[in-house]
């Protein structure tokens, strides 16, 4: 049976009727049966031949599925024009459908809700296409610009700075002195023999690279000139652009020696001249260089650290120390020193320990002026909580007595008094957070006074504030908030006062509004001279599901005291299937006495609440609305309003803040109810 089936498949040919159909479509009415049979055999052979060639292409492509491209290649191999049209990269999953005697294959597309398309915000406008030219090479050298890759990566700069012997140097060959030193330094021929000395004198002479002057190109010299002039110039816009270029340009590796020398010499000259502005500009240059991710400043720290520390502990940085704010420069430079210690301090260079020793030595000295004392404390405090705990807290009592002797003693110098005040503020600022972590609550001023002296009460108050601020920040971190950036439309219905019963009104909010805020304001005449009875409070609640919306009709009744008449105003509210925001508006305005009717009236306050469905989008059952409290409970403390009746207002802006006048002139007499957190 298997052999017969294979034989049947191998002799499969097209039916002769198909040839007749093709001939009739071409205008040939009568064709003989023998001719149809010959054409059928020929077409079947050609189709099988093309299929075999296509299978060969499939096998050569190491694929398991035959594609249309294989058929095209087979047709091209036979010099047959291939089929033209659109080709899909993936197989299209067609679905089959039949009905009415017809068979149809179609591509199933995903159904898209029209409301989703309408409510989807428009995408951002794409940027315009622009072309920018830059130099790939100038005289055979690649320029160091942001468009080109950096000439030396940061890892290579670090390797050259920390391990210069391991980096490949030009002029040193494989059989040079480095290789001889590495192989012959620890070589031993046998037991009992002494180690051979390094063959430095026996081998070939050293090939020393001649000292060359590192010259900058004309473009780099021009860039250096423009950058330095802009950084210390008078134009703030150019200075900002220059600092941004220093912080982001990847091609400044060759100009780092010039920049470090410029900063070092600039600080040395301007400290003598007490030029505070230029010192600030130079420190901003240091900050920009440290922010550049492509630069490694290890080889230039020996020039930058003295310049920065000079701006911290210098006795005088400006011409008028009692007026100019040189304290901000000392704080900024202290943060720079802390950043340098964080990035470049190792167990080999001990940068942080040496800087800490310098600051401590200047602070402990009794003859140190208050400006230098402030800078030393700021530099130590910026190094971290461990430094504060170890070096600053044990000396708080002595420093507090020194500060008290200046502030409470006879006035010797206004500069000393200002400096002592700044030192006291600095100590309270940095020590309070550390003490809040070290000491358990509660905080007692007597205990602080006994441990820290005159600074104890002030430290206690600052520690209490630090604890409260930390607790507030923890609450803000743990609280989940939802920020809604879409505009909130407000729909307000105002009715004019009528002597007779009010007519029913219908209020509907369209479902296309994303987050509606519904506000119903009941208008009445001016307040009567006698005190009005407590108003009636109505709460309208509705729940919505993903399939349909829930409508509730609530009759609002107002009755004048002492009369038997009752006014009924049913309001029907349609809530869309989204989560609206609860909005409460209650206003009251006194009309002129000439237009106010004599009869008393009542006031209504409406709260519209819509609860989201429990399993929205997941097929879960909708949530049930909360029970509506009776209208007679919880009288409202807010009054009504006299508005221009018969006008419907719809706005796209958020509702006004409490206490602001509305567009129709009415003002709220009491605070609105707080909006619940979403």
UniProtKB/Swiss-Prot annotation:
UniProt GO cellular component terms: cytosol; MLL1 complex; nucleus; protein-containing complex; SAGA complex; SLIK (SAGA-like) complex; transcription factor TFIID complex; transcription factor TFTC complex
Residue numbers carrying Phosphothreonine: 120, 248, 660
Biological processes per GO annotation: DNA-templated transcription initiation; mRNA transcription by RNA polymerase II; negative regulation of cell cycle; positive regulation of transcription initiation by RNA polymerase II; regulation of transcription by RNA polymerase II; RNA polymerase II preinitiation complex assembly; transcription initiation at RNA polymerase II promoter
Residues covered by region (Disordered): 142-201, 524-574, 611-678
InterPro entries given in the database record: ARM-type_fold, Histone-fold, TAF6, TAF6_C, TAF6_C_sf, TAF_TATA-bd_Histone-like_dom
Compositional bias annotation for Low complexity: 542-574, 633-646
Family: Belongs to the TAF6 family.
Record's function text: The TFIID basal transcription factor complex plays a major role in the initiation of RNA polymerase II (Pol II)-dependent transcription. TFIID recognizes and binds promoters with or without a TATA box via its subunit TBP, a TATA-box-binding protein, and promotes assembly of the pre-initiation complex (PIC). The TFIID complex consists of TBP and TBP-associated factors (TAFs), including TAF1, TAF2, TAF3, TAF4, TAF5, TAF6, TAF7, TAF8, TAF9, TAF10, TAF11, TAF12 and TAF13. The TFIID complex structure can be divided into 3 modules TFIID-A, TFIID-B, and TFIID-C.
PANTHER family from the UniProt entry: TRANSCRIPTION INITIATION FACTOR TFIID SUBUNIT 6 (PTHR10221:SF9)
Protein name: Transcription initiation factor TFIID subunit 6
Organism of origin: Rattus norvegicus
